[in-house]
């Protein structure tokens, strides 16, 4: 690059471990972005005070200090990168990188260098280690000569590491010449006071700037008292207590709920907090929109006139979610994202949908999509490969809904289901305006193509891109597309078919996959005819006329006939149906099958194995019983005739 350099695998080093990402260095400054999204660092050229090189294990480390006292460490440079970048810093920034050497002697005595908000321990003028004073939570004098620095033990630091630094103790003898004291104030006291002044902490526990009591938090679920401190926030609940440094706060989201008196406030974290084995990258809070609060900030006059001048006010009175986000924004330095230009059919900021088995709302934002409240899922536009509108295959009430599939560049997919039909135009227009690729209508994802399918008439077929694709491609007689059409017409209540082998594991909604299989095998010609655009009603009548003679004997089943074999999915459904009803009180009967289908698809082959084993046993049972049934003894024949005569 003529105007800069780009590196694909550079890690940002800190208390949270090493996070690999993309680093760009140009004449305007330094930008680093974590791989897979999340934390980002931007340092303007005018804010850079100094740069330095340090030789570390297997690579080189670039240190960047800013006017605000922040110190960034980027690790992963090759030896051949050092000369070219050093020349670039000299020519573009006017900064000559210093070369820091590490001490490997193993000695634990030396000198302390305090610069900005960084403490560096030197052994023989070489660096042994360094820590950021911004991570210091408090200091304590131990005896006459020892000073202990305690670090923030928050729930995000070291989320990807097994160990995290908690405290360091320094021994400062009375003979120390760097921190000169007197009889009433020994060198250890001088050192302690110096750290307190530079780290902006008190010798005791830091008081909260402001506290919001009994806030409803949906993820992780519970009611918490939210304390905003100068360098961290704390969530105090009855069962859990989380401490989060502001350096882990990536962004704030302020998202009102449509037609409801609540507002979401989301705090995005990197690294996330951890509760047991569960990671929470987003804290989802729910405020009552009309609640008014009056808060007084507990901040010294010195800080109000320096660090927070023209940012924070001494007191606030207003809506609780606005006061909360305003104070948190300036304390943490994170930006706030609010709804953009998108409006739903009800003039709201989001559309109702479901993700996996959870109902929620999807917010189309200016730079991404955000599904709330559970599981909170943020998808940036830069991460999206394409989107696709999908019509429900089933008929009836489901025909008034559609799905939105978002496929990421990492090949991961998010399927947002059960979006109301009247939101189709709004979503398509918004997504098109963002330049996102739309894989729809057989690849013809144009505005005219979608408009032809999404006409304003009330015909249910108008919203079905798959049905239109079938009609346009009738000559090809695509079995895959015809499956969807036959599925919408044939409704035998999801009963099992005669074939109940291993293919049933693909069923997603209470045996729907089995219905597909039966339709494909027995009526291929009728499927092709349906693709020519015949009305569903006429198709059904024609099918009834042509098969009336065959169907009459089947109206009454032989009670002595053996019970059909069940698939692995059906065994799974029997076991889990009651659990689903307990987890989702009041769930509709039709939704139970959808939830079961989603859970079945997410299960691994090992998890399915017990149910598939039962299916194989049941299949053999049915095979044996049907053999005896079809080859009965004379007595059994008489019994069968008696049954038919009843």
UniProtKB/Swiss-Prot annotation:
What segment(s) does the record annotate as region Disordered? 471-569, 601-646
Which residue numbers delimit the DNA-binding region?
561-630
What InterPro entries does this protein's entry cite? HMG_box_dom, HMG_box_dom_sf, PH-like_dom_sf, RTT106/SPT16-like_middle_dom, RTT106/SSRP1_HistChap/FACT, SSRP1-like_PH1, SSRP1/POB3, SSRP1/POB3_N
Biological role stated in the UniProt entry: Component of the FACT complex, a general chromatin factor that acts to reorganize nucleosomes. The FACT complex is involved in multiple processes that require DNA as a template such as mRNA elongation, DNA replication and DNA repair. During transcription elongation the FACT complex acts as a histone chaperone that both destabilizes and restores nucleosomal structure.
Q: In which tissues is it expressed?
A: Widely expressed. Present in embryos, shoots and roots, whereas it is not present in terminally differentiated cells such as mature trichoblasts or cells of the root cap (at protein level).
Instruction: Provide a GO biological process annotation.
Output: DNA repair
One example of the protein's molecular function in GO is:
DNA binding
Q: In what ranges is there compositional bias, type Acidic residues?
A: 476-493
Q: Which organism is it from?
A: Arabidopsis thaliana
Q: Which domain of life is it from?
A: Eukaryota
Xref: SUPFAM superfamilies: HMG-box, PH domain-like
Name the chain's protein.
Answer: FACT complex subunit SSRP1
What the entry lists under PANTHER family is as follows: FACT COMPLEX SUBUNIT SSRP1 (PTHR45849:SF1)
Phenotype upon knockout? Failure of fusion of the polar nuclei during megagametogenesis.
**Residue spans of biased composition, Polar residues class:** 633-646
Q: Would you tell me the Gene Ontology cellular component terms?
A: euchromatin; FACT complex; nucleus
Q: Which UniProt keywords apply?
A: Chromosome, Developmental protein, DNA damage, DNA repair, DNA replication, DNA-binding, Karyogamy, Nucleus, Transcription, Transcription regulation
Question: Could you describe the subunit structure of this protein?
Answer: Component of the FACT complex, a stable heterodimer of SPT16 and SSRP1.
């Amino acid at each position: 690059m003529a105007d800069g350099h780009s590196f694909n695998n550079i890690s940002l080093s800190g208390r949270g471990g090493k996070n690999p990402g993309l680093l760009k260095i140009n004449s305007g400054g330094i930008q680093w972005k974590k791989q897979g999204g999340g934390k980002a660092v931007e340092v303007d050229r005018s804010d850079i005070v100094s740069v330095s090189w340090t030789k570390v294990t297997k690579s080189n480390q670039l240190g960047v200090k800013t006017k605000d006292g922040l110190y960034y460490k980027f690790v992963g440079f090759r030896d051949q990168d050092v000369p070219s970048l050093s020349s670039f810093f000299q020519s573009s920034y006017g900064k000559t990188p210093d070369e820091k050497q590490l001490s490997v002697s193993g000695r634990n005595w030396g000198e302390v260098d305090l610069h900005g908000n960084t403490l560096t321990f030197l052994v023989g003028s070489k660096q042994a280690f360094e820590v950021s004073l911004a991570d210091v939570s408090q200091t304590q004098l131990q005896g006459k000569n020892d000073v202990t620095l305690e670090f923030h033990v928050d729930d995000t630091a070291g989320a990807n590491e097994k160990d995290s630094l908690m405290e360091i103790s320094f021994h400062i003898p009375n003979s120390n010449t760097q921190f000169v004291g007197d009889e009433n104030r020994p060198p250890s006291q001088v050192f302690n006071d110096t750290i307190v002044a530079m780290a902006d902490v008190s010798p005791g526990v830091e008081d909260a700037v402001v506290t919001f009591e009994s806030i409803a938090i949906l993820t992780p679920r519970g009611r918490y008292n939210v304390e905003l401190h100068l360098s961290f926030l704390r969530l105090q609940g009855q069962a859990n207590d989380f401490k989060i440094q502001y350096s882990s706060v990536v962004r704030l989201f302020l998202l009102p709920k449509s037609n409801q008196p609540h507002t979401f406030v989301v705090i995005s974290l990197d690294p996330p907090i951890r509760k047991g084995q569960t990671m929470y990258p987003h804290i989802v809070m729910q405020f009552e929109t009309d609640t008014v609060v009056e808060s007084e900030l507990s901040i010294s006059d010195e800080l109000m006139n320096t660090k927070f001048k023209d940012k924070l006010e001494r007191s606030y009175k207003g809506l609780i979610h606005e006061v909360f986000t305003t104070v948190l924004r300036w304390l943490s330095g994170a930006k706030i994202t609010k709804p953009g230009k998108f409006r739903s059919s009800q003039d709201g900021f989001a559309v109702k949908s479901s993700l996996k088995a959870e109902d929620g709302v999807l917010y189309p934002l200016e730079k991404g999509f955000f599904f709330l409240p559970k599981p909170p899922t943020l998808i940036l536009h830069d991460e999206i490969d394409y989107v696709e509108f999908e019509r429900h295959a089933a008929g009836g009430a489901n025909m008034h809904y559609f799905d939105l599939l978002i496929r990421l560049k990492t090949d991961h997919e998010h399927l947002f289901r059960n979006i109301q039909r009247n939101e189709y135009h709004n979503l398509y227009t918004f997504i098109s305006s963002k330049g996102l690729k739309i894989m729809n209508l057989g690849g013809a994802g144009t505005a005219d193509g979608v408009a032809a399918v999404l006409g304003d008439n009330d015909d249910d077929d108008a919203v079905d891109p798959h049905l239109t694709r079938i009609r346009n491609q009738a000559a090809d007689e695509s079995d895959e597309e015809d499956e969807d059409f036959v599925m919408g017409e044939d409704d035998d209540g999801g009963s099992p078919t005669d074939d109940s082998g291993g293919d049933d594991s693909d069923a997603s909604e209470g045996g729907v996959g089995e219905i597909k299989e039966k339709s494909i095998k027995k009526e291929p010609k009728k499927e092709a005819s349906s693709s020519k655009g015949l009305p569903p009603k006429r198709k059904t009548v024609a099918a009834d006329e042509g098969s009336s003679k065959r169907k009459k004997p089947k109206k009454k089943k032989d009670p002595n006939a053996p019970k059909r074999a069940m698939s692995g999915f059906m065994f799974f459904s029997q076991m889990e149906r009651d659990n689903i009803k307990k987890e989702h009180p009041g769930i509709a009967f039709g939704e139970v099958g959808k939830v079961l289908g989603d859970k079945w698809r997410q299960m691994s082959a090992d998890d399915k194995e017990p149910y598939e084993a039962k299916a194989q046993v049941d299949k053999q049972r049915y095979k044996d019983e049907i053999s005896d049934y079809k080859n009965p003894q004379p007595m059994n024949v008489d019994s069968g005739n008696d049954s038919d005569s009843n």
